UniProtKB/Swiss-Prot annotation:
Family affiliation: Belongs to the SEDS family. FtsW subfamily.
Class of the enzyme per the UniProt entry, highest EC level: transferase
Name of the protein this chain belongs to: Probable peptidoglycan glycosyltransferase FtsW
Organism lineage string: Bacteria, Pseudomonadati, Pseudomonadota, Gammaproteobacteria, Alteromonadales
UniProt source species: Pseudoalteromonas translucida (strain TAC 125)
NCBIfam families: ftsW (TIGR02614), PRK10774.1 (NF008042)
Length: 398
């Protein structure tokens, strides 16, 4: 019995040693903890914020909770898979992923499901996939690869600077046809940030920003519903039951939060007063129920996650992993800007854009793609640390 038990233990040790899996110590543990905390908070707050709407629409207060739970389970599976995929695969596949993204954006215009006047979702059984969320990550992957292949051209030749802008314009045109200006703005800011970090000339950088701002203003002025949003943002109290209704209700939620909030589940504004309480305006419900302390804590966690993403990108670039570094930086900029827009819109600092709060808002496609992005960050960090470790051990042997 003793020999048998010893043999089994030895076999288990050998099997574990031979299994090719990354060491937990080589992962960015703070980033992983931040993601898990945000997902946990998101599940609780989606449950709290969605109950009145779920009861009214479906007669089941846990309708959105169940769906969010399913997407969380899928997210964990995709996260685990992503951390196991070598970054070399993403690097080789990024041109094809760009084409897949374009295909999805075309498909959604043909067979997409319309919700609140926007055709952004491809119906797949009981679920809807938001094409622009997938296209966003695929585009960032392509731009990162382009900057590696054409970095000197981007720095020295105007053609190298314009080429990625043309690709962005093709994506932006299809996304605006849905319409979805918020996603286009996120992609634009991230693209500008990457081009700047890649060493584009300063005058090109400023021209691009001014052009982008002018185009956004033009798109707002030409679309009455966007103009109405801006007017509602600038003067919400002039029309508190019309153009300014959503922002007024959101600000009322903030005002009732105080230091420690009304308590979990005790929000008044989510009771059919605040539209999109569990999606775009979930941060207002968090402010009302958890107060200043809760809001500040979540922002600290989100800020830490963004900081870790940017640090991972910086370390990758220092170690000669340019594609991995640019992609990690793109993800960090994406998370940071989307957080700023979501929080700013709910607090009346920015016009509403219909963007989710990373890892917290209800929205399956957003959650899935952001979790995949977090998995990429951990994989980049793992490969960078492994390369450094191997270089160190190789130098020590010599």
């Amino acid at each position: 019995m003793c020999y048998g038990g010893t043999a089994m233990m030895a076999f288990a040790d050998i099997k574990e040693a031979l299994t090719p899996k990354p060491s937990a110590q080589l992962y960015d543990v703070p980033l992983l903890y931040c993601m898990l905390m945000l997902m946990g908070v998101g599940f609780v707050m989606v449950t709290s914020a969605s109950m009145p709407t779920a009861d009214r629409l479906f007669g089941n207060i846990y309708h959105f909770t169940i769906r969010h739970g399913i997407f969380l389970a899928l997210s964990f599976c995709l996260f685990w898979i992503t951390t196991s995929v070598p970054m070399s695969w993403w690097k080789k596949a990024n041109p094809y992923l760009l084409l897949v993204g374009l295909g999805l954006l075309l498909i959604v215009l043909i067979v997409g499901r319309e919700v609140n006047g926007s055709t952004r979702w491809i119906p797949i059984g009981p679920f809807n996939i938001q094409a622009s969320e997938l296209a966003k990550l695929f585009f960032f992957s392509y731009i990162s690869g382009y900057l590696v292949r054409k970095r000197s051209e981007v720095q020295e030749n105007i053609k190298g600077f314009i080429k990625p802008i043309l690709v962005f314009a093709a994506y932006a045109g299809l996304i605006l046809m849905q319409p979805d200006l918020g996603t286009v703005v996120v992609m634009f800011v991230t693209t500008v940030g990457l081009l700047f970090l890649a060493g584009a000339k300063l005058w090109q950088f400023f021209v691009l920003i001014l052009t982008g701002v002018a185009l956004v203003i033009g798109l707002i002025v030409l679309e009455p519903y966007r103009m109405a949003r801006v007017i509602g943002f600038l003067e919400p109290w002039d029309d508190p039951f019309g153009k300014g209704y959503q922002l007024v209700q959101s600000l009322m939620a903030y005002s009732q939060g105080d230091w420690f909030g009304q308590g979990l589940g005790n929000s008044v504004q989510k009771l059919q007063y605040l539209p999109e309480a569990h999606t775009d305006f979930i941060f207002a419900v968090i402010a009302e129920e958890l107060g200043f302390v809760g809001v500040s804590s979540i922002l600290i966690v989100l800020g830490t996650l963004v900081f870790r993403a940017l640090l991972i990108g910086q370390n990758a670039l220092k170690n000669g992993k340019e594609y991995e570094g640019y992609l990690a930086l793109a993800i960090g900029i994406w998370f940071a800007f989307q957080t700023m827009v979501n929080v700013g819109a709910s607090a009346g600092i920015l016009p509403t854009k219909g963007l989710t709060l990373p890892f917290i808002s209800y929205g399956g496609s957003s959650l899935l793609m952001m979790t995949i992005a977090a998995g990429i960050l951990l994989r980049v960090d793992f490969e960078t640390k492994m390369a450094t470790k191997q270089a160190t051990s190789g130098g020590a042997k010599r």
